[in-house]
């Protein structure tokens, strides 16, 4: 079982975060994380401009302990108190329910939704459509501790070009098997966005 801590940052200079991703990864991996990615929201309604630092852990406690150790590092404290440092404005904990491919830098399109988790057959259909359209990885997450969004789910589609995401969405949302699965699970999208992944 894997969990993701998602810390949201707001500020005028995302380069402070982007330029220090190697250090952040060094520190969280030293505490047992499989790594950290930064999602710079570029088209996400009211979330546009936010950066979300997502770190991946084997347990919730390990995640919190690992992040606490990172925040206590003098190098991180120096970054956090610098004049242009973004401010942490929120944090979510999610549980990984489905995965396909290996996520990495590039782009991501995400959809938050209400409804049950997809079954094996439904996920296989989604991954086949994604693969045909150049999607490099998929993660489906259960938003466990996410304020008013708790109990929803999020599907994240990683890609090398935003065109991959757009083409995949066009096929997926008109696919009869996907539509049938959406009816079975009670799928209702509540938010959608695009991000640069660092």
Identify the residue ranges that each predicted region occupies.
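Short S/T/G/P-rich N-terminal loop/turn motif that feeds into the first structured element of a domain
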Residues: 1-198
């Amino acid at each position: 079982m894997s969990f993701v801590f998602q810390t949201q940052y707001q500020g005028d200079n995302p380069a402070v975060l982007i330029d220090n991703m190697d250090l952040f990864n060094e520190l969280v991996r030293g505490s047992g994380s499989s790594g950290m990615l930064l999602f710079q929201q570029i088209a996400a309604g009211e979330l546009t401009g936010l950066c979300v630092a997502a770190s991946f852990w084997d347990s919730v406690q390990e995640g919190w302990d690992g992040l606490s150790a990172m925040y206590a590092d003098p190098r991180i404290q120096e970054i956090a108190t610098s004049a242009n440092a973004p401010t942490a404005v929120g944090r979510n904990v999610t549980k990984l329910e489905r995965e396909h491919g290996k996520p990495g830098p590039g782009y991501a399109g995400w959809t938050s939704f209400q409804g049950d988790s997809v079954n094996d057959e439904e996920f296989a259909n989604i991954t086949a459509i994604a693969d045909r359209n150049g999607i490099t990885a998929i993660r489906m997450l259960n938003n466990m501790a996410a304020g008013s969004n708790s109990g929803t789910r999020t599907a994240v589609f990683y890609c090398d070009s935003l065109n991959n995401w757009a083409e995949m969405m066009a096929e997926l949302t008109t696919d009869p098997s996907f539509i049938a699965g959406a009816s079975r699970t009670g799928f209702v999208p509540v938010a959608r966005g695009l991000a640069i992944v660092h």
